[in-house]
Amino acid sequence: MLFGELAQYFEKIEKTTKRNEMMEILADLFKRVDKEEIEKIIYLLNGRVAPDYEKIEFGMSEKLVLRAMALALKVPIFDLEKVYKEVGDLGELIIKYSQNEGKDLTVVETFNTLFEIANLSGEGSVDAKVNRLAFLINSLTPQGGKYLVRIVLGKLRLGVGEPTVMDALSFAKVKDKSLRPFIERAFNITSDLGYVAKVFWEGGIEALKKIKVEVGKPIRMALAERVSKVEEIVKRLGKCAIEPKFDGFRCQIHKKENNVRIFSRNLEDNTHMFPDLVEAVLKQFSDKNVIIEGEAISYNPETGEFYPFQVTVQRKRKYNISEMVELYPLQLFAFDILYLNGEDITSLPYIRRRQKLEEAISEGEKIFVTKNIITNDPKEIQAFFEECITEGLEGIVAKRLDAPYQAGIRNFNWIKLKRSYQGHLADTVDCVILGYFKGRGHRAKFGIGALLVGVYDDERDLFKTVAKIGTGPTEEEWVRFREVLDEIKLESKPNNVESLIEPDVWVEPKYVVVIQADEITRSPVHTCGRELDGLGYALRFPRVIGFVREDKGPYDATTVKEILEMFRGQKKEKVEEDSDNL
């Protein structure tokens, strides 16, 4: 396939906001490509040349891209800069100035050159990147060049989510979505949809079924449902394991021989940030190859007390790492093991995995297996919960004893119960920032005064609004919000956002913030869970807690289903309170 043909598909996707239409366009594209192209096209759809967990970036600013364009288009850079200020999209400048109507490269040739650009480093690499990009611009159709520069700048933003791509992969093969569960299972245990698609194209459904957990490929993390009372845990699980819920970084640690990689909840490779944990893993799992999960939390070495998340988050940085190791040492509380010495053990029941974890770890001062109790007694669970709260922890997690580890799935195999506050919802809500409103009055000087936030509809692969928030952040945080959001601002509403509200500035759905609210109410202006009566669901008196949660991505946000579940639980609690007061 020629890159210009792929660009035509990008154009079609960009022009639609309908999920099914987007899926059909993708399915038509996938039908036309071979096993060598499918992997590369999946990555390019995401604006990348590798899976998300690989830190491969193009490393080219707008200034460098303009240099490459000036070189390729033979237009003075001053003229390009002047027009760019008017149109705001370097891709449109390619359309305006390119004379390459008869030229093109294949998708594979274009991808391979982009991969070279991303991997260039060291002395002379800047000029080499500019020259290679200029070669590509000069070799592609105007439309191809338009999408090329958007990819390089991280501004492709087609609004295509992984669920839509998985549906399209199935549809391309069997004209329905029946193969989606097999594709999703493979994706959940590899976090690499390009690789999964390539295996599928090479060997069909049987090859997909043979994909196994592999050290170095992060597994999409299992997630817990939430309840507001101990009794609900016993009702759903009966006899179960109860573990503490720590307020730190959830980590998935991969060790093979002397190589260690540490992935965050949203599958970022954070290995370099935690040299103390790497050292501990090599010591405490010295003769084993493992994938374990746990929660890393900073603590006061003099008192043994755990620091709150706002302190722990300071360990997540690129610079002065050794200084942070000394200031805020970490402990890791391991709660699961998914792979051991060549064996994928995700299918084993929780109780067996727990046993293998305890057997695999050696004693040390950094990594511990989380304590737990096994019971079906609500009083015993309540006592354990209160003990955790007293220790400064978030709450507890209950786990079904016979449950396998279900990668990427949120269900009632795991149930979390967090500390609640009088007049608040029993749990916070993780929302995605969709846009912002310019400040008025005192906040006019910041240029930002409120956020439009939403939750994720995982059935329709859309973000839906749930609140407009103007309280919580400090003045310094408002300034930081403006800075980070302006880096991802958009000219119009993204295709994967459903909203009745128009903020002053739309942004790419990328950053997650934690929201505390008093309750959930029905709303005529928000689209979360919107029903035939025109009413959706909204957070009442929402407040932002802290700044952006860098350990969470947009698809880790609270879902529409969870909001509806919280609303039903809230109504049930009110009925019970009213009956208690009779």
Swiss-Prot record:
Enzymatic class: ligase
Residues the record lists as binding ATP: 243, 250, 265, 295, 335, 410, 416
Alphabetized InterPro entries for the sequence: ATP-dep_DNA_ligase (IPR050191), DNA_ligae_ATP-dep_bac/arc (IPR022865), DNA_ligase_ATP-dep (IPR000977), DNA_ligase_ATP-dep_C (IPR012309), DNA_ligase_ATP-dep_cent (IPR012310), DNA_ligase_ATP-dep_CS (IPR016059), DNA_ligase_ATP-dep_N (IPR012308), DNA_ligase_N_sf (IPR036599)
Active site positions, chain numbering: 245 (n6-amp-lysine intermediate)
The enzyme's E.C. designation: 6.5.1.1
Cofactor(s) in the UniProt record: Mg(2+)
Keyword Iron listed: no
Keyword terms, alphabetized: ATP-binding, Cell cycle, Cell division, DNA damage, DNA recombination, DNA repair, DNA replication, Ligase, Magnesium, Metal-binding, Nucleotide-binding
Catalysed reactions, semicolon-separated: ATP + (deoxyribonucleotide)n-3'-hydroxyl + 5'-phospho-(deoxyribonucleotide)m = (deoxyribonucleotide)n+m + AMP + diphosphate
Pfam families registered for this protein in UniProt: DNA_ligase_A_C, DNA_ligase_A_M, DNA_ligase_A_N
GO MF annotation terms: ATP binding; DNA binding; DNA ligase (ATP) activity; metal ion binding
Function, in words: DNA ligase that seals nicks in double-stranded DNA during DNA replication, DNA recombination and DNA repair.
Protein name: Probable DNA ligase
Organism: Dictyoglomus turgidum (strain DSM 6724 / Z-1310)
Origin organism lineage: Bacteria, Pseudomonadati, Dictyoglomota, Dictyoglomia, Dictyoglomales
